[in-house]
């Protein structure tokens, strides 16, 4: 299985970078996982709704360019309006994708303003991490941990309780 996290902006905090690297290492036996980062767009202080929409559009264009243009990836966007999966449901989702030969996944993480409608339209699946709001730089770590947990569940290995 090949999994790409396509995300806006670099993870800047060292403790988050360390966590991301730890889960990338833990995932090596299970899947080929990589993180593709596109630059975030500066948000002017006191930005108007039109300026915020323009920021999301520019970031969205970058995200869309980073996705596989050949349609070989199943695109999963993270959005608060998406489907809430339990850890077991995420495990079943990954197993189902692998079973049906759809084993190339791109998880798309937007910037601090969210995702442009054009990116949402590209989604094969829309996933929510829950109703809470997370600092968008934390999302790669949270998502990688959940993907790791899902592989452990699918293999019946000790980790998930």
Curated annotation (Swiss-Prot):
Chain sites annotated for binding S-adenosyl-L-methionine: 78, 110, 129-134
Main location: cytoplasm
Annotated CDD domains: RlmH-like
Subcellular location: Cytoplasm
Keyword S-adenosyl-L-methionine in annotation: yes
Natural source organism: Symbiobacterium thermophilum (strain DSM 24528 / JCM 14929 / IAM 14863 / T)
Assembly with partners or alone: Homodimer.
EC number: 2.1.1.177
Catalytic activity: pseudouridine(1915) in 23S rRNA + S-adenosyl-L-methionine = N(3)-methylpseudouridine(1915) in 23S rRNA + S-adenosyl-L-homocysteine + H(+)
Protein name in UniProt: Ribosomal RNA large subunit methyltransferase H
């Amino acid at each position: 299985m090949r999994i790409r996290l396509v995300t806006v902006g670099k993870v800047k905090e060292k403790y988050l970078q360390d966590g991301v690297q730890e889960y990338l290492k833990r995932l090596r036996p299970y899947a080929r996982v990589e993180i593709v980062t596109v630059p975030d767009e500066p948000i002017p202080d006191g930005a108007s709704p039109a300026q915020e929409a323009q920021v999301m559009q520019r970031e969205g264009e970058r995200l869309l360019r980073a996705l596989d243009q050949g349609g070989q990836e199943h695109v999963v966007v993270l959005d608060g309006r998406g489907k809430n999966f339990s850890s077991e449901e995420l495990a079943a989702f990954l197993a189902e994708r692998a079973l049906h030969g759809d084993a190339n996944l791109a998880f798309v993480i937007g910037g601090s303003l969210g995702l442009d409608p054009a990116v949402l339209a590209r989604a094969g699946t829309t996933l929510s991490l829950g109703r809470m709001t997370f600092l968008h730089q934390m999302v790669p770590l949270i998502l990688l941990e959940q993907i790791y947990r899902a592989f452990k569940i699918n293999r019946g290995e000790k980790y998930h309780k």
